[in-house]
């Protein structure tokens, strides 16, 4: 299989695409990454719709999308256009179409772009199981072409562009039966429609591969880019994590998916889907886009590293086990969290540890490993005595100016872990190997940590360690280019079993949230990393950073330490107040560790995304809700005033409820 999906996994270069115009806005080519959003008003409400569009435009949104679910909605588009013209607005509009080709033919007259979902434009979702022969499959494609071609021809005639937007939650039965609920199915779903458009000489196309799970979403976009390379297609990509949710969790998921793909050079326009007021999506999208719009491409090529991943599927990078006391990492153990603390004196140190335990009780998390940041050598005795009162390992990060002399090496034997930079702490390689061997013989382990600029010097070291039988070693990197430098490290270690600790140093919690989600999160979804460690300079941030570490593991679906919510951002199809409903359900169920609950405004993606959730709460009509167990409806048309309680009863029935006092 050809694993190539971008220029290189080890450095930044944006994928070259054709330019697609959406009104006066240009997507792809050499243009900056475009920011867009979607309003959540009813499209028949002219005043409310225009108000939201203008608010988004003022906030910096460059393209606005709205749903057009029916002929009545399409009939109101001229009124919306007229009011926007009066207000002096020139922002391009996108009509979002599901299920209704006839409505698309009306909407295309009044917008700059049409979005169609290949999973439901010409198909109805029945979850039917059927084996298609090749001839039967071809007949289905002919049927789709007959339905889709009129819209393509009208778009071509009017100069209207199109997004072919696949959603993981709404693949057609035809695709599901042939390819399964997979990234490959998502890609092939889009390609079927692209081929039809190309047969009519229409190329003003943008493509998206959205999913609520960032891992699935990233794999699908990579596979799409790889297939584009094979087929010599150069369409721009619209990036987004659908149903990302709200608050920090929604921002983390979005940054993991969107940010890591932008790092790979994939993506020309982005939408951050939050279950919040649409204007709150724009600052997040701008932050992500500006990181790359301002990025300078380094002229030198990256050589000497080879692809060691399958970028289209998740497979954990295998490492040997590290075990000290009750602490276990690597091998098949969950990805662990290490917390960095300063040390002033024993009392303040132990108080900080107690604070972390107390904080963690509310979220079912607790400290797993502690690292003391650059203590002076004369503090080691006091640190050792304080650490003896704890059941978790306490390690020492040696400062840059500390020399690892024989006296210090002896003092460090009291610590299960020492972190050092071989290029700062040792001038003699033989002495370093002797130090590592002595610690291994004593049942201790060591972390070799250096800057990304020196990573080339790691080449050959894993072979040397393996030859002399040193195993109790893990590796980490200090870098602003976390994704690329850790991939380089992974390439160097690919034939060995040394664990990898993912380390990130950031100036403040906001930078930590976004940059760790992009860098560390982007590595975790590829199976790279046995421990994570996030560091900021201020002591007051420790609880927030402690929580962020676990939130990253939650966002990548590697460790669920709280309830996982899959909630859509709301649109004109939504059949209840999604923000209020999501907040209400969170207040009832937020303590259910590891339970996945989907809150969906309507049926467009609802049933499909239920497959990724334990329970679902989906709008079925005004004042009515369907409740799901997995992807199966178990309670239909539940009155909304009792739906929350019925959801709790459903969770209890299936044995996944916990009383708050027991958590």
Swiss-Prot record:
<dbReference type="Pfam" id="PF04551">
    <property type="entry name" value="GcpE"/>
</dbReference>
<dbReference type="GO" id="GO:0141197">
    <property type="term" value="F:4-hydroxy-3-methylbut-2-enyl-diphosphate synthase activity (flavodoxin)"/>
</dbReference>
<dbReference type="GO" id="GO:0019288">
    <property type="term" value="P:isopentenyl diphosphate biosynthetic process, methylerythritol 4-phosphate pathway"/>
</dbReference>
<comment type="function">
    <text>Converts 2C-methyl-D-erythritol 2,4-cyclodiphosphate (ME-2,4cPP) into 1-hydroxy-2-methyl-2-(E)-butenyl 4-diphosphate.</text>
</comment>
<feature type="binding site">
    <location>
        <position position="602"/>
    </location>
    <ligand>
        <name>[4Fe-4S] cluster</name>
    </ligand>
</feature>
<dbReference type="InterPro" id="IPR017178">
    <property type="entry name" value="IspG_atypical"/>
</dbReference>
<dbReference type="GO" id="GO:0016114">
    <property type="term" value="P:terpenoid biosynthetic process"/>
</dbReference>
<dbReference type="GO" id="GO:0046429">
    <property type="term" value="F:4-hydroxy-3-methylbut-2-en-1-yl diphosphate synthase activity (ferredoxin)"/>
</dbReference>
<feature type="binding site">
    <location>
        <position position="609"/>
    </location>
    <ligand>
        <name>[4Fe-4S] cluster</name>
    </ligand>
</feature>
<keyword id="KW-0411">Iron-sulfur</keyword>
<keyword id="KW-0479">Metal-binding</keyword>
<keyword id="KW-0004">4Fe-4S</keyword>
<comment type="pathway">
    <text>Isoprenoid biosynthesis; isopentenyl diphosphate biosynthesis via DXP pathway; isopentenyl diphosphate from 1-deoxy-D-xylulose 5-phosphate: step 5/6.</text>
</comment>
<dbReference type="GO" id="GO:0051539">
    <property type="term" value="F:4 iron, 4 sulfur cluster binding"/>
</dbReference>
<dbReference type="InterPro" id="IPR011005">
    <property type="entry name" value="Dihydropteroate_synth-like_sf"/>
</dbReference>
<keyword id="KW-0408">Iron</keyword>
<dbReference type="InterPro" id="IPR045854">
    <property type="entry name" value="NO2/SO3_Rdtase_4Fe4S_sf"/>
</dbReference>
<feature type="binding site">
    <location>
        <position position="571"/>
    </location>
    <ligand>
        <name>[4Fe-4S] cluster</name>
    </ligand>
</feature>
<dbReference type="InterPro" id="IPR004588">
    <property type="entry name" value="IspG_bac-typ"/>
</dbReference>
<feature type="binding site">
    <location>
        <position position="568"/>
    </location>
    <ligand>
        <name>[4Fe-4S] cluster</name>
    </ligand>
</feature>
<dbReference type="GO" id="GO:0005506">
    <property type="term" value="F:iron ion binding"/>
</dbReference>
<keyword id="KW-0560">Oxidoreductase</keyword>
<protein>
    <recommendedName>
        <fullName>4-hydroxy-3-methylbut-2-en-1-yl diphosphate synthase (flavodoxin)</fullName>
        <ecNumber>1.17.7.3</ecNumber>
    </recommendedName>
</protein>
<comment type="similarity">
    <text>Belongs to the IspG family.</text>
</comment>
<keyword id="KW-0414">Isoprene biosynthesis</keyword>
């Amino acid at each position: 299989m050809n694993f190539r999906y971008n220029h290189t996994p080890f450095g930044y270069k944006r994928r070259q695409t054709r330019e697609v115009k959406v009104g006066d806005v240009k997507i792809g080519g050499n243009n900056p990454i475009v920011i867009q959003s979607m309003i959540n008003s009813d499209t028949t409400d002219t005043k409310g719709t225009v108000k939201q569009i203008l608010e988004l435009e003022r906030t910096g949104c460059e393209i606005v999308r709205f749903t057009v679910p029916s002929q009545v909605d399409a009939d109101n588009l001229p009124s919306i256009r007229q009011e926007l013209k009066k207000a002096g607005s020139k922002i391009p509009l996108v009509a979002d179409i599901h299920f209704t080709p006839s409505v698309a033919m009306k909407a295309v007259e009044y917008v700059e772009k049409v979005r169609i979902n290949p999973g439901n434009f010409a198909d109805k979702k029945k979850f039917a199981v059927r084996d298609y022969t090749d001839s039967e499959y071809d007949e289905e494609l002919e049927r789709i072409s007959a339905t889709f071609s009129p819209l393509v021809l009208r778009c071509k005639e009017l100069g209207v562009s199109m997004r072919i937007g696949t959603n993981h939650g709404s693949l057609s039965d035809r695709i599901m039966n042939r390819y399964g609920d997979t990234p490959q199915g998502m890609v092939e779903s889009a390609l079927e429609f692209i081929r039809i458009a190309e047969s009519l000489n229409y190329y003003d196309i943008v493509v998206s591969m959205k999913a609520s799970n960032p891992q699935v979403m990233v794999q699908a976009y990579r596979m799409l880019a790889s297939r584009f390379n094979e087929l010599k297609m150069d369409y721009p990509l619209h990036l987004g994590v659908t149903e990302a949710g709200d608050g920090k969790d929604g921002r983390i998921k979005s940054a993991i998916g969107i940010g890591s793909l932008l790092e790979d050079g994939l993506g020309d326009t982005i939408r951050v889907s939050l279950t919040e007021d649409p204007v709150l999506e724009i600052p997040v999208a701008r932050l992500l886009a500006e990181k790359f719009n301002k990025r300078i491409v380094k002229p030198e090529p990256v050589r000497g590293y080879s692809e060691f991943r399958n970028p289209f599927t998740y497979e954990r990078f295998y490492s040997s086990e590290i075990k000290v006391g009750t602490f276990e990492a690597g091998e098949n153990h969950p990805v662990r969290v290490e917390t960095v603390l300063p040390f002033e004196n024993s009392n303040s140190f132990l108080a900080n540890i107690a604070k972390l335990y107390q904080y963690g009780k509310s979220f079912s998390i607790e400290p797993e490993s502690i690292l003391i940041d650059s203590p002076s050598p004369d503090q080691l005795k006091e640190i050792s005595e304080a650490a003896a009162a704890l059941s978790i390992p306490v390690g020492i990060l040696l400062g840059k100016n500390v020399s690892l002399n024989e006296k210090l090496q002896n003092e460090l034997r009291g610590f299960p872990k020492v972190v050092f930079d071989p290029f700062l702490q040792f001038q003699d390689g033989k002495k370093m190997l002797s130090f590592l061997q002595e610690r291994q013989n004593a049942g201790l382990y060591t972390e070799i940590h250096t800057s990304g600029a020196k990573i080339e010097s790691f080449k050959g070291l894993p072979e040397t360690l393996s030859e002399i039988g040193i195993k109790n070693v893990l590796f980490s990197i200090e870098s602003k280019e976390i994704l690329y430098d850790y991939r380089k490290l992974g390439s160097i270690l690919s034939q060995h079993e040394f664990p990898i600790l993912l380390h990130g140093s950031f100036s403040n919690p906001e930078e930590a949230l976004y940059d760790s989600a992009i860098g560390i999160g982007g590595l975790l979804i590829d199976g790279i990393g046995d421990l994570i460690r996030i560091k900021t300079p201020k002591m007051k941030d420790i609880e927030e950073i402690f929580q962020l570490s676990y939130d990253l593991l939650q966002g990548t679906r590697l460790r669920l330490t709280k309830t996982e919510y899959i909630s859509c951002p709301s649109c004109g199809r939504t059949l209840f107040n999604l923000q209020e409903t999501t907040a209400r359900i969170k207040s009832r169920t937020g303590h259910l560790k590891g339970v996945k609950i989907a809150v969906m405004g309507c049926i467009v993606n609802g049933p499909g995304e239920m497959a990724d959730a334990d329970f679902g709460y989906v709008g079925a009509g005004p004042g009515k809700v369907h409740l799901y167990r997995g992807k199966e409806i178990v309670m239909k048309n539940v009155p909304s005033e009792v739906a929350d309680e019925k959801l709790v009863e459903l969770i209890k029935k299936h044995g996944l409820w916990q009383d708050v006092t027991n958590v």
